[in-house]
């Protein structure tokens, strides 16, 4: 595992032990498997406060048709509910909470973690396309005034397993993807070229353009 965004003077008492990482990440991977079995991108997340899970989630993007329902956002909503029900100060609770997730949080989720002042994140594999903890942007540790506080990451726990689950998902046919359509107006009668746009997933995912020449 690799430490990212280390601040030795900040919240070292929250540094999870190896046994804690093993225990909580095992449960996060169980959530990721559940996501995969339900046709979602296999990401699972737990939020642990005083050795208690106060929020957990898996991706629910396809189920809810809402591109923001990432595992971390689902778990954060549960944390807010947990605090309200117990009349706890959410800010104080979040400052004592560790987040465990199977894939590096995206830029959106990393920004939410900053705003809520989550001090520690443990994650599995990197998110090379959307990662907010160093892979694309370093939302976790960059100096960003008025955006909450930076947080420390421990990266790489069971990373290969997390990657394999992602590969399994993307090899499957996405039932929510629109059917490929031929753009008739793009046919050039002179060279017979037709352009086909194929949507591989929801609108927030990649659009691949395939050019076919006769």
Swiss-Prot record:
Cofactor requirements of the protein: Zn(2+)
Binding site for Zn(2+): 70, 106, 109
GO terms, biological process: tRNA wobble adenosine to inosine editing
EC number of this enzyme: 3.5.4.33
Catalytic function, reaction form: adenosine(34) in tRNA + H2O + H(+) = inosine(34) in tRNA + NH4(+)
Record keywords: Hydrolase, Metal-binding, tRNA processing, Zinc
GO molecular function: tRNA-specific adenosine-34 deaminase activity; zinc ion binding
Domain of life: Eukaryota
InterPro entries given in the database record: APOBEC/CMP_deaminase_Zn-bd, CMP_dCMP_dom, Cytidine_deaminase-like, tRNA_aden_deaminase
Active site positions: 72
UniProt family annotation: Belongs to the cytidine and deoxycytidylate deaminase family. ADAT2 subfamily.
Stated name of the protein: tRNA-specific adenosine deaminase 2
Organism: Danio rerio (Zebrafish)
């Amino acid at each position: 595992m690799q430490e990212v965004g280390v601040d030795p003077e900040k919240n070292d008492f929250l540094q999870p032990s190896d046994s804690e990482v093993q225990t909580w990440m095992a449960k996060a991977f169980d959530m990721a498997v559940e996501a995969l079995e339900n046709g979602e991108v296999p990401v699972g997340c737990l939020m642990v406060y005083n050795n208690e899970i106060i929020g957990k989630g898996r991706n629910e993007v396809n189920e809810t048709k809402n591109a923001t329902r990432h595992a971390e956002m689902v778990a954060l909503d549960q944390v807010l509910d947990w605090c309200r029900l117990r009349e706890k100060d959410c800010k104080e609770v979040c400052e004592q909470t560790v987040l465990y997730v199977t894939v590096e949080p995206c830029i959106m989720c990393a920004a939410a973690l900053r705003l809520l002042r989550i001090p520690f994140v443990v994650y599995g594999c990197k998110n090379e396309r959307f990662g907010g903890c160093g892979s694309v942007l370093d939302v976790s540790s960059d100096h960003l005034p008025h955006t909450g506080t930076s947080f420390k990451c421990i990266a790489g726990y069971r990373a290969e397993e997390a990657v394999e689950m992602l590969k399994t998902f993307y090899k499957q046919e996405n039932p929510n993807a629109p059917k490929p359509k031929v753009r008739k107006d793009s046919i050039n009668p002179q060279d017979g070229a037709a352009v086909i746009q194929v949507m591989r997933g929801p609108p927030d995912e990649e659009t691949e353009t395939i050019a076919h020449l006769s």
